[in-house]
Amino acid sequence: MANVLDELLDRGYIKQFTHEEETRKLLENEKVTFYIGFDPTADSLHVGHFIAMMFMAHMQRAGHRPIALLGGGTAMVGDPSGKTDMRKMLTKEQIQHNVDSIKKQMERFIDFSDDKALIVNNADWLLDLNYVDFLREVGVHFSVNRMLSAECFKQRLEKGLSFLEFNYMLMQGYDFYVLNQKYGCKMELGGDDQWSNMIAGVELVRRKAQGDAMAMTCTLLTNSQGQKMGKTVGGALWLDADKVSPFDFYQYWRNVDDADVEKCLALLTFLPMDEVRRLGALEGAEINGAKKILAYEVTKLVHGDEEAKKAEEAANALFSGGADMSNVPTVIISKEDLGSTVLDVIAKVKIVPSKKEGRRLIEQGGLSINGEKITELTRTLNDDDFKDGSALIKRGKKNYNKIEIQ
C-alpha cells in the first residue's frame, strides 16, 4: 500500500519535517491522529486555509484521523508569526461567532461522521488554566533565549513584542500536549510560517509525555514569482459565497498565470497526478482548457457542483457573447440610485471595496458599463443603461457584475 507521504510529497504539499523517517514509519504502520490549527480571527476561511484542508483531506482519505483545532483561546492572545504589528484584539463574543461560522465551512471538506474527524476549540482548556500551574508545568520546558531566536519573534523585537504575544508559543505547544493526552494525537500539520511554534509543541510533548510527537509543514500557496496567492481587488479570496461569489471565485482560478496551473491543480484538486502533469504541460491556447478544469474543480470543492456549473456557464456566456447572464453575480439598486455617479453606486453595492479603488479603476480605463468604457468620474447611471433590464459592469479584463433595479 502506498504511503500517503509519497502522495503529499509528489503533490508538493510538504515543506519541512521535524522527524522525516519517523513520520514515514508512523504513517505506514498506524492510523495516525493529527491536527491542524485554524485561527478564528474572521468569520470565514480563505484560500490560504483551503490548502491546509486539502492536506487534511488527503490524510483522511489514507485512513488517518484529522483534528481541526479552532483557536478560540489563542485568538484571545494573537499569533505574532509573520506580523510586524500587534493584531487587533477580538472579544469573546466575536471569536465565538467566528468559530461557529468556520465549523460550518469545514464540514463541507472533511468527513466528521462516526468520529472520523474532530473539531475542537482550545478555549475549552486554555480559558480556565491556572496561570501559576501553567508556568510550573509548561513554562519550565521553554528557554527564553531559544524563543527569542525564533523567526516568529525576531521580526517583532525591534517594533516591540508584548508579553501577551510572547505567551503564544507556549499556548500552541500546550495545545499539542492536550490533544496528545486526550485524543492520542501524535502529529501537527501547519503552514510553514508556524515552524517555530510547531517545533515547540513537538518538544513539549516529547518531554512531558515521553512519546511520539512530530510535525510537518505545508507549503504556502504562492505563484511562480513567490508571491502569496489568494488576493483579489476586494481583498482575500474568501470561501464564503457571501464574501466572494462563486462566479468571482471561479474567475480567479480561470485567470491564474500559465506557470501556476500545474501547482494549483496538484495542491487544490484531487485529480490524479498523471492528469495534473498532462494539463500542466499544455501550452498556448490549450492551457486555457487546463485553467477551465482548474477553476471548475476548485469551485466544485468549495461551493458544490451546482454552483461550479453555474459559474462555468456564466463565464462561457460572457466570453462567447452568449445571452445567458443569469449566473453572473447580481446586485440590486433602487430607482433613487439613478442619477448617482457610477462610482458612487459600485462602491455602495460593494462591486469595488471602496470609492478609492473605483476611482483608480476608472482612471486606469478598467471599468465599463454595457461595453462602454467609463472615462469620467462624474458619469451617472441613467435609464438608458437598463434598456435590457440590467446593466453589465466589467472590472478589469474578466470580472463582471450585473446591476438590476428593484
Curated annotation (Swiss-Prot):
It comes from the Bacteria. Residues 340-405 form the S4 RNA-binding domain. One of its GO terms (biological process) is tyrosyl-tRNA aminoacylation. Keywords: Aminoacyl-tRNA synthetase, ATP-binding, Cytoplasm, Ligase, Nucleotide-binding, Protein biosynthesis, RNA-binding. A motif ('HIGH' region) lies at residues 40-49. Belongs to the class-I aminoacyl-tRNA synthetase family. TyrS type 1 subfamily. It is found in: Cytoplasm. A motif ('KMSKS' region) lies at residues 228-232. InterPro entries: aa-tRNA-synth_I_CS, aa-tRNA-synth_Ic, Rossmann-like_a/b/a_fold, S4_RNA-bd_sf, SYY-like_C, Tyr-tRNA-ligase, Tyr-tRNA-ligase_bac-type, Tyr-tRNA-ligase_bac_1. One of its GO terms (cellular component) is cytosol. Catalyzes the attachment of tyrosine to tRNA(Tyr) in a two-step reaction: tyrosine is first activated by ATP to form Tyr-AMP and then transferred to the acceptor end of tRNA(Tyr). It is an enzyme of class 6 (ligase). It holds the Pfam family SYY_C-terminal. HAMAP family: Tyr_tRNA_synth_type1. Its main location: cytoplasm. Homodimer. The keyword Aminoacyl-tRNA synthetase applies. L-tyrosine binds at Y35, Y168, Q172. It catalyses: tRNA(Tyr) + L-tyrosine + ATP = L-tyrosyl-tRNA(Tyr) + AMP + diphosphate + H(+). This is Tyrosine--tRNA ligase. The keyword RNA-binding applies. SUPFAM superfamilies: Alpha-L RNA-binding motif, Nucleotidylyl transferase. It comes from Clostridium botulinum (strain Eklund 17B / Type B). One of its GO terms (molecular function) is ATP binding. ATP binds at K231. Gene3D superfamilies: HUPs (3.40.50.620), RNA-binding S4 domain (3.10.290.10), Tyrosyl-Transfer RNA Synthetase (1.10.240.10).
